[in-house]
């Protein structure tokens, strides 16, 4: 395929030193020999709004801690833009190409096939079976590219039909891959745009010919697509593959944020993006200390499955005493027949006992003392008790989540109060206690919210009682602090406000620290036992 002037990996020994200072990219499928230097020709195509939301100066290249109020300040990370991720990709491709000496876009496809694991690629590359390797990666071996057949005088001078749209075009309007299948430029552009925009495909776009699995290289894509938005989307798809395969990289989960967080080692630790979103690097959810990722994932799934219907189920259904399928009573008759095709049990709605002993007295159930009916009712009660337990923790979890949303709005109110205080002979530094108090309040709300997830899966023991006492103490102090900031801030004198708020937020900080330290100590000493849901 002809090379492109744009999104291109150029290799040139004479310009190696100059190229090292320029931005780099991912390239073509050129047949020329590959040298040492690597250049990204179209980094300028990346719109900051798409690439990362901010220009390069927004990247936290010096690393960072988890943010205010968090305990682990040794977990280093940096926030990267899409341009910087692209440069990391180019460096990875350059490292491999120093050894295998292939066109850069071919190397990119090989690396993608091995999930960007350079060691695995090298091992396979030198195991002596290159033909099999390139076949598995769906590319033509660059050292064995088929010779291009010369066009006859007749075919080169006459219009030819495209095998997709069947319109006639001059031969110069056709292009294709090393597999030899050629189509018109318009069909190529439409095909690639559909694959990228509608199907979300980037690294696995194959030749449009029937039963041809040869992959389209980056240079071909960037040459044949004219819409800059489609090019940006393609670049994002390629970089997404690189990020998803790298255990040290994670996309920021905030909507419309295209930053990537890079860490020195993967762990369930808090990281903060430049957009302000703080999340757990391990699972990508909002930072959720003290509950572990495993239990939070189970909780989120349970809430998604249960929260909207649990109240209705509790009030309107019972379980089949045989197969435990949930059954709704749709008539006045108490003679129930389970509609589970593998069950078909007949039972009494009132006592949940077998229907057969009821005889003709279906309207006047007298089986309450039967052992089998009692066992069925016991099972039903256990199910209801489990549901009530879930609702207990879910309601408190959701309540703290809602309070946290409201208290984020306190910042505007507090800012206004801080300005008023500065007009009453208080310095800017002296009024910072109010912002600090709101910070602590939000941290405590977040911690309390996740303590209910932790408690839901926690088995009762002596340590769990201590945990619940710490939880209750922190919850009470948090509510008092919330009251100070929402009501007393506009009523009390300035000195009274300052003393009350400072004392309470320091106490909240202390109790939050005690609670988290106790939970972490339990993790270290294996003190916690869990209820498998």
Swiss-Prot record:
Enumerate the CDD domains for this protein: BRcat_RBR_HHARI-like (cd20343), Rcat_RBR_HHARI-like (cd20356), RING-HC_RBR_HHARI (cd16626)
Record-level Gene Ontology MF annotations: ubiquitin conjugating enzyme binding; ubiquitin protein ligase activity; ubiquitin-protein transferase activity; zinc ion binding
Which intervals hold the zinc fingers (RING-type)? 162-212, 320-351
Say which enzyme class the record assigns: transferase
- What is the organism field in this record? Danio rerio
Q: Where is this region: Disordered?
A: 1-35, 48-73
Q: What is this protein called?
A: E3 ubiquitin-protein ligase arih1l
Q: Which reaction does it catalyse?
A: [E2 ubiquitin-conjugating enzyme]-S-ubiquitinyl-L-cysteine + [acceptor protein]-L-lysine = [E2 ubiquitin-conjugating enzyme]-L-cysteine + [acceptor protein]-N(6)-ubiquitinyl-L-lysine
